């Protein structure tokens, strides 16, 4: 199940994603390898990134690697509604709407974590900061985030609890 602004925006998002796929040869090579090797077979991956065409492509590459991918935005102001709709159209559970309130944004993050991910990729640290609270995904074994944006999100005053995964 996805939560996006408007599924009728999907054609525009599909065009953007296709353009990126045509002009990102590094990920294309990785995708080819993942298609053959399926390194993420049987794993659920929650991905919190700026929800736009380049990062949507990353989600598709992870899916080619066998992962069950659940995608959300790491910043409601950078989420592109057409790309979110396109990903939902392509069968990737997507939780992202441009311009939501802080509470709605957190609700989208919570929805994403309901998949009980084995792995978490988090650009800003907001998704990881929810771990350890009442929505802790007990099957998670690792989380990765981009260091600088996550520094504030994961500082002791902002995080919900200690992060229970490496």
Sequence positions of predicted segments:
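N-terminal ligand-binding/catalytic initiation module
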Residues: 1-166
């Amino acid at each position: 199940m996805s939560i996006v602004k408007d599924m009728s925006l999907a054609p525009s998002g599909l065009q953007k994603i296709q353009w990126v796929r045509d002009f990102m040869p590094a990920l294309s090579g990785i995708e080819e390898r993942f298609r053959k090797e399926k390194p993420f077979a049987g794993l659920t991956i929650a991905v919190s990134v700026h929800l736009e065409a380049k990062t949507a492509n990353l989600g598709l590459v992870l899916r080619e690697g066998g992962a069950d991918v659940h995608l959300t935005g790491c910043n409601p102001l950078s989420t592109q509604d057409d790309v979110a709709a396109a990903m939902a159209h392509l069968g990737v559970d997507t939780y992202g709407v441009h311009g939501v309130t802080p509470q709605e944004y957190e609700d989208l993050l919570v929805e994403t974590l309901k998949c009980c991910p084995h792995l978490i990729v988090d650009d800003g640290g907001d998704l990881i900061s929810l771990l350890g609270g009442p929505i802790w995904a007990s099957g998670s074994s690792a989380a990765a985030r981009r260091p600088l944006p996550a520094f504030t999100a994961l500082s002791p005053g902002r995080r919900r609890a200690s992060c229970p995964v490496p």
